[in-house]
């Protein structure tokens, strides 16, 4: 059984083909610069040289058509025909309150996703375009939607509601939704496995740190709070996003610099965070390198990021009670030993005893690592995320009629005999 995972961004289409029977990725890749011009595909097959082809893709349909032609190409492909694909899983960033789990896509589901696209105007429209294009190009194949927000639909009202006029929530859906749900789900299940306890008996803080950053408080195996809010802008310091700031700052700066609402939104989403502080960098490797050379603003960016990480660990520990583990994941979380160290050093009083040697050695995206001492009351793990595996398992279970929701479904990666491929 071959499952295709699609992730359609504003100017890109990521894809992966997973052989469910053999439990291996058979191909993956990305079409970049969709719509904007000079588009190209990079196609990766294990054991082969990467394949790159430049081809104009004026829209997502053209990009997905290029993906299909590439994966079925006689020379660089891995399939004889698109009919070998059993189903397609689509990442959808925002499902609003309607979608609490992954669902098979029909016209009603697609219309419901369109109804909430105003909540994610940068992300849902390309997701929708990708779904429409893929359904048109592969009409005989089942399509499934996997929502970034679904994992967080277990949050209680006191965690997801903002202290603003209640009719904003009733009339416009203004509340905390949270994102990166599939990543938080995967690493929390793996952490429970490493702890040797059922997920429903674990209290875990998961820290997804890439260019986008979100943290999640998981109590008894379910999300009870998360840092991102109505949009992915709230919360931790990110590569280009500000995260938490005084809500009065946008209006203040709009007046001071005569900025429109659209312009201030762009500044907070695309010109703030690590980039805003350093003035030059979003890649933490560049920031760490130049901080070591004495660049004050790079050092300041690292200090601010680590300080905010530490604050959220403390806040979420207070919210969920006795803490079993903290998990770092995603690009920076998995590879940024220096940032991890700054975030968790000095937390011995709350039961976190960092092993600096272990932390320094956990610089790979292929291995799960414990970075605290053996006797640390709270364990800290580095766990490479695998959102595509969550996509695949949800799709297969929906096809087989065995899927209920992410809380009750027994994922293969939550079992003792799981081996990461």
Swiss-Prot record:
Cofactor: Mg(2+); Mn(2+)
Gene3D superfamilies cross-referenced by the UniProt entry: 3.30.420.40
Record has ATP-binding as a keyword: yes
EC number: 2.7.2.1
Gene Ontology terms, MF aspect: acetate kinase activity; ATP binding; magnesium ion binding
Residues the UniProt record annotates as site (Transition state stabilizer): 180, 241
Highest taxon in the source lineage: Bacteria
Entries under PROSITE patterns matching the protein: ACETATE_KINASE_1 (PS01075)
Binding of substrate, residues: 91
Chief site of localization: cytoplasm
Pathway as given in its UniProt record: Metabolic intermediate biosynthesis; acetyl-CoA biosynthesis; acetyl-CoA from acetate: step 1/2
Compartments, record wording: Cytoplasm
Residues at the active site: 148 (proton donor/acceptor)
Matches recorded under CDD domains: ASKHA_NBD_AcK_PK
Keywords for this protein: ATP-binding, Cytoplasm, Kinase, Magnesium, Metal-binding, Nucleotide-binding, Transferase
Assembly and interaction partners: Homodimer.
Family: Belongs to the acetokinase family.
Protein name: Acetate kinase
Gene coding for it: ackA
């Amino acid at each position: 059984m071959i499952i295709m995972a699609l992730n359609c961004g504003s100017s890109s289409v990521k894809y992966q083909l997973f052989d469910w029977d053999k439990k291996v990725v058979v191909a993956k890749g990305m079409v970049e610069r969709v719509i904007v011009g000079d588009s190209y595909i990079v196609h990766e097959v294990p054991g082969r040289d990467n394949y790159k082809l430049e081809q104009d893709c004026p829209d997502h349909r053209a990009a997905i058509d290029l993906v299909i032609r590439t994966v079925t190409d006689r020379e660089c492909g891995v399939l004889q025909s698109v009919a070998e694909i059993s189903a397609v899983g689509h990442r959808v960033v925002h499902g609003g309150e309607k979608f609490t789990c992954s669902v098979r896509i029909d016209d009603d589901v697609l219309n419901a996703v369109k109804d909430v696209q105003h909540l994610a105007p940068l992300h849902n429209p390309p997701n929708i375009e990708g779904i429409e294009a893929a359904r048109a190009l592969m009409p005989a194949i089942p399509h499934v939607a996997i929502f970034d927000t679904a994992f967080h639909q277990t949050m209680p009202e006191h965690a997801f509601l903002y202290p603003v006029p209640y009719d904003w929530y009733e009339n416009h859906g203004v509340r905390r939704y949270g994102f990166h749900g599939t990543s938080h789900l995967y690493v929390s299940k793996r952490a429970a496995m490493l702890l040797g306890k059922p997920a429903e008996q674990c209290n875990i803080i998961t820290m997804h740190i890439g260019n986008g950053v979100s943290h999640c408080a998981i109590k008894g195996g379910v999300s009870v709070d998360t840092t991102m809010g109505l949009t992915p802008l709230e919360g931790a310091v990110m590569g280009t996003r500000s995260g938490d700031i005084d809500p009065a700052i946008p209006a203040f700066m709009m007046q001071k610099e005569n900025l429109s609402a659209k312009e201030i939104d762009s500044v907070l989403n695309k010109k703030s965070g690590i980039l805003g502080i350093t003035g030059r960098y979003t890649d933490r490797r560049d920031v760490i390198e130049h901080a070591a050379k004495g660049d004050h603003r790079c050092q300041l960016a690292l200090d601010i990021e680590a300080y905010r990480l530490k604050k959220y660990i403390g806040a979420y520990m207070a919210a969920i009670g006795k803490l079993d583990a903290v998990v770092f994941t995603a690009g920076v979380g998995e590879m940024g030993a220096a940032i991890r160290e700054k975030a968790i050093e000095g937390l011995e009083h709350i039961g976190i005893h960092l092993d600096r040697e272990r932390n320094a050695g956990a610089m790979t995206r292929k291995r799960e690592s414990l970075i605290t001492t053996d006797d640390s009351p709270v364990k800290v793990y580095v766990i490479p995320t695998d959102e595509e595996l969550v996509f695949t398992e949800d799709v297969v279970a929906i096809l087989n009629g065995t899927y209920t929701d992410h809380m009750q479904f027994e994922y293969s990666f939550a079992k003792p005999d799981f081996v990461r491929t």
